[in-house]
A protein has these predicted regions:
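Short beta-strand-loop
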Residues: 42, 67-104, 119-128, 145-150, ...
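Residue-level signal for alpha-helix termini/capping positions
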Residues: 61-64, 126, 156-157
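Solvent-exposed loop/turn segments at secondary-structure junctions
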Residues: 35-39, 75-80, 95, 108-111, ...
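VWA/integrin I-like adhesion module and closely mimicked acidic/polar interface patches used
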Residues: 105-106, 140-185
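Von Willebrand factor
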Residues: 25-89, 107, 117-118, 132-138
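Short, Lys/Arg-enriched N-terminal segments with co-localized hydrophobic residues
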Residues: 1-2
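Conserved donor sugar-nucleotide recognition element shared by glycan-biosynthetic enzymes
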Residues: 114
Length: 185
């Protein structure tokens, strides 16, 4: 199928999931970072936002500097808003430091409009004739009344050479399934 999906769920070690996934090999990529208020929660005594930032840094430092990658975030500017989605760093080669700096400066305070954020990232990448990859890093499920499963099916049907990767952590089994269908479709 045109949309290939990889689901990596990790209960505790986000970095191992991200570092093991060959998600940044070719084409353009956008990492969609969950900056919602729930990222202040903890796993084994560590804030989830700290784990996500560390994993992001590890992935970026291990990739080819010529890889075109960008960063989109949600929940980082407004508390309680489903519209708080921003392309913070447009996909380009050599953006690793800009992405790291943006993630390190980010506030974590809003809701989780993950479906709309992935839709916008896919739209941003749609103009490319290369393979396009969206990597969603999240600790939660959709909180803005959208359906990640329907979005996955819609993106699959759109005909874009598109891959979605979902890295979920700190999720219950039910929450994991709700997010996984985005990538599985």
């Amino acid at each position: 199928p045109i949309m290939r999906a990889l689901l990596r769920l990790s209960a505790f070690i986000l970095c191992q999931s991200l570092c093991a996934a060959p998600v940044l090999a070719e084409g353009k990529s956008i990492i969609v970072l969950d900056a919602s208020g729930s990222m202040w929660g903890q796993i084994e005594g560590r804030a989830k936002l700290e784990i996500a930032r560390e994993a992001l840094g590890t992935v970026l430092s291990s990739m080819d500097p010529e890889t075109e990658i960008g960063l989109m975030a949600y929940g980082h500017r407004e508390k309680g808003s489903c519209e708080d989605i921003e392309l913070v760093v447009p996909p380009a080669a050599g953006t690793a430091q800009a992405i790291t700096d943006a993630a390190n400066a980010m506030q974590f305070l809003g809701k989780t409009p993950l479906s709309e954020a992935v839709r916008r990232a896919a739209a941003e990448l749609k103009s490319t004739e290369e393979k396009a990859t969206v990597i969603l890093i999240t600790d939660g499920i959709e909180t803005c009344e959208a359906d990640p499963c329907a979005l996955g099916a819609e993106l699959e049907a759109s005909g874009v050479d598109f891959t979605a990767h979902v890295v979920g952590f700190g999720l219950t089994e039910e929450e994991g399934k709700a997010v996984a269908c985005l990538a599985e479709n």
